[in-house]
Each structure stands twice: as C-alpha cells, then as structure tokens.
Curated annotation (Swiss-Prot):
Protein name according to UniProt: HTH-type transcriptional regulator CynR
Record's subcellular location: Cytoplasm
Biological function: Positively regulates the cynTSX operon, and negatively regulates its own transcription. Binds specifically to the cynR-cynTSX intergenic region.
Keywords carried by this UniProt record: Activator, Cytoplasm, DNA-binding, Repressor, Transcription, Transcription regulation
Membership in a protein family: Belongs to the LysR transcriptional regulatory family.
Gene3D superfamilies per record: 3.40.190.290, Winged helix-like DNA-binding domain superfamily/Winged helix DNA-binding domain (1.10.10.10)
Native source species: Escherichia coli (strain K12)
Pfam family, one: HTH_1
Taxonomy, superkingdom: Bacteria
GO cellular component: cytoplasm; protein-DNA complex
Cytoplasm recorded as keyword: yes
NCBIfam families with a match to the protein in the record: PRK11242.1 (NF008416)
GO molecular function term, any single one: DNA-binding transcription factor activity
Induction, as annotated: Negatively autoregulated.
Amino acid sequence: MLSRHINYFLAVAEHGSFTRAASALHVSQPALSQQIRQLEESLGVPLFDRSGRTIRLTDAGEVWRQYASRALQELGAGKRAIHDVADLTRGSLRIAVTPTFTSYFIGPLMADFYARYPSITLQLQEMSQEKIEDMLCRDELDVGIAFAPVHSPELEAIPLLTESLALVVAQHHPLAVHEQVALSRLHDEKLVLLSAEFATREQIDHYCEKAGLHPQVVIEANSISAVLELIRRTSLSTLLPAAIATQHDGLKAISLAPPLLERTAVLLRRKNSWQTAAAKAFLHMALDKCAVVGGNESR
C-alpha cells in the first residue's frame, strides 16, 4: 500500500464520485478506479458501495477513513520533520488568521519574520475561526491566530494578548475630540459593522445584548478595509480593536466606559504534533511582538 492509495481513497470519499475525485486529483478515472480496486484487494474488503447512483462508503470504508486520515497527517508531518532545519535556512510555514488581526498585528509580524528568516516560505490566509480550527485539525495549517475560547479539544491555545474594542470614528466626527465616552452613547450612533460571518461581529452582538444595548447598524460589510473606508468618508462609526485605528490615517479610537468587550487573542496549534523550527520561531516572535503591542496599548 502506498500513500497514493490513501490520497485516492480519501478523495473519492470526499467527493462521492470517481469522476469528480479524478478531476480533483488530475488523473484519469480508469486509473483512479484501478488504484481503489488494488487498495480494496489488499485490505480484503470493499470500501465503497457502487450499487447506487452515488458512491458511498461501506461500513468498513467509514472505519478505514478515520485511520487513513490520521496516517496521511502523520506522513505529512514526517516529511516536514525530515526537511526541517534547525538553523532556519529553509522550510515553510502555513498560517491562518481571523481578519481583524491582519492590519495591526499580522502584517508587522510577518514583515519582521521575513526580515529575520528570508529563506522560510510563508503561506498566509484569512478565514473564519471555525475554518482555522478545522484546517488545523486536518493538518492543513501549522499555526492559527484567533480568539479564546477554542472549540476543538485537539488544539492547544497559547495566549498572545488581550485587546479591547473601541468606538472608531473619522477625525472629523463630532466625538473625535473625546478620548473616552460612555457605553450608552452607542444608542445614538449609526454604525458600520462587519457582517455576521466574522467572530468580531458575533462577539459584538452578544455583548450588546448582554449590556441591553441596541445600536443602529445601518451598513454591514464583509471586509475590514470597506468598513474603514466608509468610516473615513462619512459621519458613521464602528466597533473594532483600538489598535486598528492607530495603523490608519484619519481615524480615531475612542475607549468605552465601561468597556464593551475585552477578548484574548491566542495562537492555535495541534496538540502533540511535530512543531517545525519555523513554527517555534514564529511563536516566539509572536509573543515578543505581543509584549510590544500590549505595552503600547497600555500607554
């Protein structure tokens, strides 16, 4: 049995079709079918029920799928371990973050990491926390940055920093003369907020309901840059981490009293998994960067 057999089996199981799996794998359907038959012969059981209009896993196939997935993860980890170099003269790092971190934290962190380790290939993606956790568990990422609490028991969460949400307005907004306003002022503000798929929006809605607040949400946007551009050009306001405003000209972050929401950012990685030298270096640099960010926010 070869790793190719495992890859082919998992592809057919995922797509529920030899045709779609063959297309995804860039192989011919007859070649794929032959490899699956070889696998079934080596195991001595049929893995797929081919009697219906769609391909379905047999009971034996369902059981073997769990072991096949874990085996593929271990093979991938082993390959990375072989190519891992402790002096960081080569290697790769797969990172995913929730979108609010990109402008004020991940951008500077990635720039510093690249400057120190230019031979490390970096892959950075923005996505929801749910997807980050899922991809980490499937060994499709090395590290993720999101928020506590973490839902998957397979993941370790290392605290990075605690951030507060602030009322962010344009410099020409009437409230921009204030450093702090009462939380109750949100009743009077017309807000631009991130859309519901963002963890930040989910947290805002939860805490507003808990505090008995009913802000006027007049625009929803599915990107941070769109929200910030609308704030710059209008008299609307938004709720975002205060640090984001410091990275963009023409914006002012106003603290709320009492604070609407404080949340802990965490670095996520799989428990008991091989950590490459690049992943370890990234963690140490992230912790150092967070100490600087936290110090700036406290002033």
